[in-house]
């Protein structure tokens, strides 16, 4: 089953609820099967790693953990506010994401 996501990699988002409410960051990765996103600088966890060629010291590393996608809202580049996403069809048949508040496009046209 394909899950429709309202955010894409590279979007600037606001965390709307939870422990990190109010924080703004860029989406590093989208995980549609888990309906989750990894946001830069948000939901930092400490992970124990064994000694390996990648981590010669071992010990603990800090990394971003996935955040449920319903907790984030994309920030509209036109109005600068966090918004819900609507879809709109263009004349050429392409579907783009649109800001629900101002109607500005969230996708850059290729």
UniProtKB/Swiss-Prot annotation:
Task: Give this protein's Gene Ontology molecular function annotations.
Answer: rRNA binding; structural constituent of ribosome
The set of disulfide-linked cysteines is none
Q: Does the keyword RNA-binding apply?
A: yes
GO terms, biological process: translation
An annotated GO cellular component of this protein is: ribonucleoprotein complex
Q: Which UniProt keywords apply?
A: Ribonucleoprotein, Ribosomal protein, RNA-binding, rRNA-binding
| Family recorded in the similarity comment | Belongs to the universal ribosomal protein uL24 family.
Its biological function? Answer: One of two assembly initiator proteins, it binds directly to the 5'-end of the 23S rRNA, where it nucleates assembly of the 50S subunit. One of the proteins that surrounds the polypeptide exit tunnel on the outside of the subunit.
What interactions and quaternary structure are annotated? Part of the 50S ribosomal subunit.
Stated name of the protein: Large ribosomal subunit protein uL24
Q: What phylogenetic lineage does the species belong to?
A: Bacteria, Thermotogati, Deinococcota, Deinococci, Thermales
Gene name linked to the record: rplX
């Amino acid at each position: 089953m394909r899950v429709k996501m309202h955010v894409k990699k590279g979007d600037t988002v606001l965390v709307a609820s939870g422990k990190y409410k109010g924080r703004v960051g860029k989406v590093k990765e989208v995980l549609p099967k888990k309906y989750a996103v990894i946001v830069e600088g948000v939901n930092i966890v400490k992970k124990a790693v064994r000694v390996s060629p990648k981590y010669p010291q071992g010990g603990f590393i800090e990394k971003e953990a996935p955040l449920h996608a319903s907790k984030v809202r994309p920030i509209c580049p036109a109005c600068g506010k966090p918004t819900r996403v609507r879809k709109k069809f263009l004349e050429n048949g392409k579907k783009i994401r649109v800001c629900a508040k101002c109607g500005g496009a969230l996708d850059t046209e290729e």
